[in-house]
Amino acid sequence: MANKEEIIAKAKDAITDFDDELAAEVAAEALAAGVDPVELIEKGFTAGMQEVGEQFEQGTLFLPHVLAAAEAMNAGIEVIKPEMEKRKSQTKSLGTIVIGTIEGDIHSIGKDIVASMLNIAGFKVVDLGRDVPIKTFVEKAKEIKPQIIASSALMTTTMVNQIQIEEQLKEAGIRGQVKTMVGGAPVTQDWADKIGADIYGESATDVVSKVKAALL
């Protein structure tokens, strides 16, 4: 049986090779070998995603590559998720986060990964899915009073709708009761600042650390 370092290295390779079958196999192997799932995700899967992201920024990889890598990571996380849920049930929730892909955008892979990472980190995540109407974010905020409303956009044509979340939360009189987080491929810190969002999530691991800093 491979040791921990070898398993983690294979997990990273599965992402950079866009191999969802290998990612699932490595995740199962890690569980059987007693590798900490969080360590596997952070040092294996997420490290692979960061490498793909860097190549995307350099222009050596393109959006379909990023999506394929994200699909591979999701395949691995799906295998690990039952174990993480078991652990999570034994610990106190760190807070509630409502997350969804913004109205007009049908892409959900990045959002799914962020939701999984937040779940693993100990937050209760209410996933609204993709192509979520602005009013649904606001209604859910009123209903369950989460600590954070998070929206993802993968296209410049849809990220403008993130402004509407800010505006409609204000109109509903609850903007001061909840923090907002924005993320997605075209989203930047400048954009988050411009629309008044509290948190900009650049990557899955970045999101977890920023959310903890904002709430804890």
Swiss-Prot record:
Residues 94-216 form the B12-binding domain. Transmembrane segments: none annotated. Keywords: Cobalt, Metal-binding, Methanogenesis, Repeat. GO terms for biological process: homocysteine metabolic process; methanogenesis; tetrahydrofolate metabolic process. SMART domains: B12-binding_2. PROSITE patterns: B12_BINDING, B12_BINDING_NTER. One of its GO terms (molecular function) is cobalt ion binding. Acts probably as a methyl group carrier between MttB and either MtbA or MtaA. Belongs to the methylamine corrinoid protein family. This is Trimethylamine corrinoid protein 1. It comes from Methanosarcina mazei (strain ATCC BAA-159 / DSM 3647 / Goe1 / Go1 / JCM 11833 / OCM 88).
